[in-house]
């Protein structure tokens, strides 16, 4: 049974930290194919891979994916999926889930959760978070933190430690890391990418701040399951390969 949302996977070849990572293999299957398979398990109405790279497109077609060739000038994955929406026949209220192309073990339940979350709110965007489990994670600028209202809407996203524990600098209770999985209404996605970057976004290098800056809400639910590591470096790939061996006893 399919659910009433669509998944688009932005698939960029020229990653700054690990070019070609989506074509690397985990037990004989490329990263991008594993992401695609996990997205299918969420039972969306469609799964589309958006890429500007011929080899990624060819591989995706070989394993049966629908592929849309996009511009090579996009600065973000959000811009890339917006091009797919603009080219397609999506209705304004269709739910579009942006699944990153470097998450080979993304849990289908999280994809379903973020899509369902959007249907429970007037906010045009939804995303997820997870409790921070150490001071090291809290103070890591590569881990994006989020603070929320009592009804689960984002107050702010930052690379800094937020909220700041004034009386105990070693505390990390009530802190959450952002999970980079988004659901958008199709019409809002197209509107969002038409806006110029805002000052906060440029300072933090976090494009979701453009939404808050512009006066719109982002719903942020705590994930129903802990997310697994994405692949940003060669070291991450080695860990992912070992995770597969350990989990499936290959």
From Swiss-Prot:
Chain coiled-coil ranges: none
RNA-binding keyword on record: no
InterPro entries associated with the record: Cytidylyl_trans (IPR003329), KdsB (IPR004528), Nucleotide-diphossugar_trans (IPR029044)
GO biological process, any: CMP-keto-3-deoxy-D-manno-octulosonic acid biosynthetic process
Catalytically driven reaction(s): 3-deoxy-alpha-D-manno-oct-2-ulosonate + CTP = CMP-3-deoxy-beta-D-manno-octulosonate + diphosphate
Enzyme class: transferase
Source superkingdom: Bacteria
Similarity remark: Belongs to the KdsB family.
Function text: Activates KDO (a required 8-carbon sugar) for incorporation into bacterial lipopolysaccharide in Gram-negative bacteria.
Protein name: 3-deoxy-manno-octulosonate cytidylyltransferase
